A protein has these predicted regions:
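Structured catalytic-domain cores with a bias toward divalent-metal coordination
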Residues: 1-172
Length: 172
């Protein structure tokens, strides 16, 4: 960031972070579409939605822990296309009309930058495009897809849960 502001929301789901689990009341990342008011995370999700739609916000990075190690090709049980760790996740390649709408390009640059400083070659990042609108119904409930639907570009950055905490923090 060369100018402007960086807003950070720390510990959005503290209980989940401390337990290294998806969420005490369900995975909060998948509560951004169709959430009932009776859900215990409803108020928190509404606050995040309000932040996302703030006119000053031009790009969202959703920092996450992911399972295993994402790889475009299957290499092993822990390193394959069905895993999420060590990836830049996008719902689509482009968001037309947005200042930072070149999601594929931004994610590739981010992965390249991270990969220049990996602690071990097996920690390399890759871009994972979920093609959410056309093929991933579960991801249509995600924070990043909510952001896209409001005209805000969003990228998920996933560090592998297989890594110790200090390394996950290093990568994110």
């Amino acid at each position: 960031i060369k100018n402007g502001n960086l807003w950070i929301i720390p510990d959005l789901n503290r209980a989940s972070i401390l337990r290294r689990a998806h969420g005490w009341y369900g995975d909060m990342n998948y509560k951004f579409n169709g959430l009932k008011k009776s859900d215990r995370d409803y108020q928190t999700v509404q606050k995040v939605k309000k932040l996302i739609t703030n006119p000053q916000i031009e790009l969202i990075f959703n920092l996450h822990d992911g399972s295993g190690f994402y790889s475009p090709q299957r290499e092993s049980y822990q390193r394959n296309p069905n895993r999420w760790g060590q990836s830049c996740v996008i719902d689509q390649a482009e968001l037309d009309g947005a200042r930072f709408g070149h999601l594929q390009l931004l994610s590739e640059k981010a992965a390249d930058q991270i990969n220049q400083h990996v602690l071990h070659q097996e920690h390399r990042f890759h871009v994972k495009n979920t093609h959410t609108a056309s093929s991933d119904k579960v991801m249509q409930k995600a924070l990043t897809y909510y952001a896209l639907r409001t005209g805000k570009p969003a990228i998920g950055l996933e560090a592998s849960k297989k890594l110790p905490t200090h390394q996950r923090v290093y990568y994110l």
